[in-house]
């Protein structure tokens, strides 16, 4: 590969200080320290199932709650993806995945369209997974979508265990990302759009 598809983004606000480094042609290596253990567990799923190297450090106002940290990690990760992918020449653009975990099944479909949009349909069976507020799952993905400039549909098709529901969503997200950002050797470096740009 002639150019490295990597990026490092730093985001500093009064609420959070975040650094994200990614290699989207990686092997799934990860170094995660967000201060939110369940978020680290979910980010690990993205790295492993997307074969994306992730190095994420975050310090946030966790004395209030995890909202700003989770949302801002999503924002910064989205910015890093946008930078690493660049002009999108040669990528497959679309990705999708179904992932089961015992009784739970989730589907994620993504389009690196340049137009942000999120359809999020996850009927969590409880409001908390340990100390993690399940509402923050949507906040993470909304932040990612808005800053990676992607259209994404996330559906939990069935599930009784909220941890399983959330984990299948993140695993499917990782696998859908992997498909969408993969370089297609047959496209000869063209942009996958009739408009000529994304």
Swiss-Prot record:
InterPro entries: IGPD_sf (IPR038494), ImidazoleglycerolP_deHydtase (IPR000807), ImidazoleglycerP_deHydtase_CS (IPR020565), Ribosomal_Su5_D2-typ_SF (IPR020568)
Name of one Pfam family that matches: IGPD
GO biological process terms, semicolon-separated: L-histidine biosynthetic process
Annotated coiled-coil segments of the chain: none
Disulphides: none
GO molecular function: imidazoleglycerol-phosphate dehydratase activity
Uppermost EC category: lyase
Highest taxon, organism lineage: Bacteria
Family per record: Belongs to the imidazoleglycerol-phosphate dehydratase family.
Protein name: Imidazoleglycerol-phosphate dehydratase
Source organism: Herminiimonas arsenicoxydans
Gene: hisB
């Amino acid at each position: 590969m002639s150019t490295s598809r990597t990026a490092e983004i730093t985001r500093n606000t009064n609420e959070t200080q975040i650094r994200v480094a990614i290699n989207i042609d990686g092997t799934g290596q990860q170094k995660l320290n967000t201060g939110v253990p369940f978020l680290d567990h979910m980010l690990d799923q993205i790295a492993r199932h997307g074969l994306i190297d992730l190095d994420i450090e975050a310090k946030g106002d966790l004395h209030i709650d995890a909202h700003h940290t989770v949302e801002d990690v999503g924002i910064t990760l989205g910015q890093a993806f946008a930078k690493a992918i660049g002009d999108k020449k040669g990528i497959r653009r679309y990705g999708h995945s179904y992932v089961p975990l015992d009784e739970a099944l989730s589907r994620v479909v993504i389009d690196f369209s340049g137009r942000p949009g999120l359809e999020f349909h996850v009927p969590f069976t409880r409001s908390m997974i340990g100390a993690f507020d399940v509402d923050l799952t949507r906040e993470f993905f909304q932040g990612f979508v808005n800053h990676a400039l992607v259209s994404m549909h996330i559906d939990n098709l069935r599930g009784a265990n909220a941890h399983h529901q959330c984990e299948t969503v993140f695993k499917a997200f990782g696998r859908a990302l992997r498909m969408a950002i993969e370089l297609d050797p047959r496209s000869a470096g063209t942009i996958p759009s009739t408009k000529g740009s994304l």
